Amino acid sequence: MNINVADLLNGNYILLLFVVLALGLCLGKLRLGSVQLGNSIGVLVVSLLLGQQHFSINTDALNLGFMLFIFCVGVEAGPNFFSIFFRDGKNYLMLALVMVGSALLIALGLGKLFGWDIGLTAGMLAGSMTSTPVLVGAGDTLRHSGIASTQLSSALDNLSLGYALTYLIGLVSLIVGARYLPKLQHQDLQTSAQQIARERGLDTDANRKVYLPVIRAYRVGPELVAWTDGKNLRELGIYRQTGCYIERIRRNGILANPDGDAVLQMGDEIALVGYPDAHARLDPSFRNGKEVFDRDLLDMRIVTEEIVVKNHNAVGRRLAQLKLTDHGCFLNRVIRSQIEMPIDDNVVLNKGDVLQVSGDARRVKTIADRIGFISIHSQVTDLLAFCAFFIIGLMIGMITFQFSNFSFGIGNAAGLLFAGIMLGFLRANHPTFGYIPQGALNMVKEFGLMVFMAGVGLSAGSGISNGLGAVGGQMLIAGLVVSLVPVVICFLFGAYVLRMNRALLFGAMMGARTCAPAMEIISDTARSNIPALGYAGTYAIANVLLTLAGTLIVIIWPGLG
């Protein structure tokens, strides 16, 4: 039996879509030196090649893909979005605005200089910034702009063409810039990271190992009684001196949970909870021949939970003010916008931050109730909330503003982005509402993006040969300029206007570009994870601003003549 593959694919949109996705994802795993192509560019290249062979796909699939993607971007940004406006993130907000705003203005200028249409210009901006949200925002605004169908088709084809031609240029140039730009300034990143570490008492090690606390029991002997010198536990400050916390005492056969007024006596058996290295550093008066193995004394349930910061008595306060160790709990990680941050006593907590805390189950529960709630370890998505806010986003996108003879609509991209932000924000405040497991959110976001990329590539593929010959050289120049010049402007603004620490500044710059590979290079150069503080500060707001930039470039373009 002979099978005509071309007819088979043309007659089955679903089969064609998944063939494009599979081939594109395989291509995306290839590396050019140290740079991996990535899923987005892999799917786009395959779809452009198949589009040249006149394969096509239903545009409804393209629309659904971009809607799912942009909605999930909003959900991820929601927990930290408003805190960047209203709290200590003003510097990060300004950096993100400078990065995105300068790129937008430069792209508009180059588009007019080279005589491109809005499709090529917006696509070049999206590719140079390696930002799919720009592409999504511009495409949606074009579809609702009311231009003639032939012009719209050409603009959408050029949009994906510009993106495809400049994406790798933007990615590679930023990675090279991240490697060499720190060497062109007077302060090296390692020194800057160490300076922040000294000021804030941080661990600068980018590969810090996280251990769980363990419990061991010791019998109080004459040396330990002499060491305490009759002081109670509060006066001794056992944790400050040893790094361990006395969780239980057995005295005269009776188990008790000690308070700060307890005084250790000869023959007491004490259960100490602490990290392994803290036990190893204990004074010999604790350890030498004094360890005991008492099933009841050691029978404690040490748990590790992820606590989401929510309550007003924790939001806006510094990490040190929580005094976790005073409550017998140990902090392992601080996570913001899915970025692990250095454990810094001076970090101001935002709503939606996640603290990974270990300790006795009852104590961890008490701490969680005080500062927020324990993250739900569920694999079930609240589909009702997901669908309801998706509908709200579509309805917001239908709103149109009229100014004399000029009108513009909010569009699906901005509407869904806003609805997603609200769902993420409400989820951070109400633990039982709108829960979406991170794995499920990542899957929907990635799948939506890949479907969108497949659609735009198949639509634009037929004209790529002509377009490449006409504007290829111009695209190379424009891509480099739009990728690197805003980074330099952002550096000068952060270094000499905001006077930011260089390690934090370079992390924030990579966050404003939403480029994780470049962030890894900055962390390696600094030999520290301290730049992650800056990356997390700009990442959430940059995703939103980039989507709006895609909308704005289409709205502004006709007014430039």
From Swiss-Prot:
Membrane topology note: Multi-pass membrane protein
RCK C-terminal domain ranges (all copies): 200-288, 292-373
SUPFAM superfamilies in the cross-refs: TrkA C-terminal domain-like
Main location: membrane
Pfam families (UniProt xref): Asp-Al_Ex, TrkA_C
Subcellular location: Cell membrane
HAMAP family given in the database record: YbjL
Gene Ontology biological process terms, A to Z: potassium ion transport
PANTHER family: K(+)_H(+) ANTIPORTER SUBUNIT KHTT (PTHR30445), TRANSPORT PROTEIN YBJL-RELATED (PTHR30445:SF10)
CC per GO annotation: plasma membrane
Keywords tagged on the record: Cell membrane, Membrane, Repeat, Transmembrane, Transmembrane helix, Transport
Family: Belongs to the AAE transporter (TC 2.A.81) family. YbjL subfamily.
Protein's name in the database: Putative transport protein YbjL
Chain segments annotated as transmembrane: 8-28, 32-52, 66-86, 94-114, 158-178, 383-403, 406-426, 447-467, 475-495, 540-560
GO molecular function, one term: monoatomic cation transmembrane transporter activity
